[in-house]
Amino acid sequence: EELIDEMKEKRGVTQDTELTADDLKELAEQFKAEYKEKIGSDFPSDPKEQLMGAVKAVFRSWDNPRANVYRRMNEIPYSWGTAVNVQMMAFGNMGDDCGTGVAFTRSPSTGEKKLFGEFLTNAQGEDVVAGIRTPMPISQMAEKFPEAFKQFQEVCNLLESHYHDMQDMEFTVENGKLYMLQTRNGKRTPAAALK
């Protein structure tokens, strides 16, 4: 992130999407140089090697101090281990028919059975929560991506029915097509939990 922020400052822009192709090429070279400095070897050019490196990094993270403290605090046995899901990348930042968002199947404040969340067009997931741009309410997704929104509503109903609990979800729309990235039981107020 620091290298990206430095490049944006150097170019006098505030958003990643304002960087040119040449800026991104320059950034890629900077990332490769930083990788070599920290790891001691060149960044692998083979995609399979890159993927396996990422998978191994997740498994190694199981033993980092923060993870150990978290497991102790939440009484999670070390023997459970961790898993790695590998899935195709969905790009929410390829144009105006793309986007990303986070949403709950219900209001986390009141428990009302109504979608609650935010989304951004032409953005990646972290952009929604980073505060770089102002997200739109999830209700406006119906206007921007009507087919994807209809499918999203169906998926939300299916997930809540399956898990018997309010869901907190992350999603991406790429070229008008919906991709569900993650779901988990949502946190809410005690009053909302009663609904």
Annotated model-derived regions:
Residues E1-K195:
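Nucleotide/phosphate-binding sheet-loop regions of phosphoryl- and nucleotidyl-transfer enzymes
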